[in-house]
Amino acid sequence: MLHRAGDREEARNRLTALWHEIGPQGDAFHRCALAHYMADTQDDPRDELDWDLRALEAAEGFVTERPDNAAPGASSVADGPGPRHPLVALRAFFPSLHLNIAADYAALDRPADAHAQLRRARASINALADGAYRQGLRDAIDRLQLRIDGAAGRMA
């Protein structure tokens, strides 16, 4: 992706065009994934938080208002990329979404909100199958927890 190669502005421009194409009533899975990527292209932590919250809103809306013809979701998802039902794929986003939102709150010096999101990330990680992705998220949650707690300790 462009933003990982250092061209955040061009990535933002292209993702914004896609966002307008999908629209607010577009497919929740696509809105979630796109907003999740869009957050990573932001320079301002408040904007990053706004996009991460949009991604979470799309995911939560889809999970709670699942289409009648959707296949029942499995209790866990496969480790890594691969085809799966969008509901299951969206459930796999929750730990990462909550982790990103926690990081956004930490960047905005809102440790209580960050801690609340870390708790949600830990609670939602059980939807993932054991494997490298799940362990990587657990490690990232632990690192952010230590960083937030360390910052709070320096302020006391």
Question: Residues of each region from the PLM?
Answer:
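Residue-level signature for tetratricopeptide repeat
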Residues: 1, 38-41, 97, 104
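"A position-specific structural signal for the A-helix of alpha-solenoid helical repeats
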Residues: 34-37, 93, 100, 139-147
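Alpha-helical segment of the N-proximal tetratricopeptide repeat
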Residues: 1-13
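Residues that mark the junctions of alpha-helical repeat units in TPR/alpha-solenoid scaffolds
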Residues: 11, 24-31, 48, 87-90, ...
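Flexible helix-coil transition and linker loops at the boundaries of alpha-helical arrays
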Residues: 20-26, 60-90, 127-131
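TPR/TPR-like (Sel1-like) alpha-helical repeat modules
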Residues: 50-61, 109-129
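TPR repeat positional signature
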Residues: 31-35, 98, 117
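Structural motif corresponding to the intra-repeat A-B loop/turn of tetratricopeptide repeats
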Residues: 5, 42-45, 108
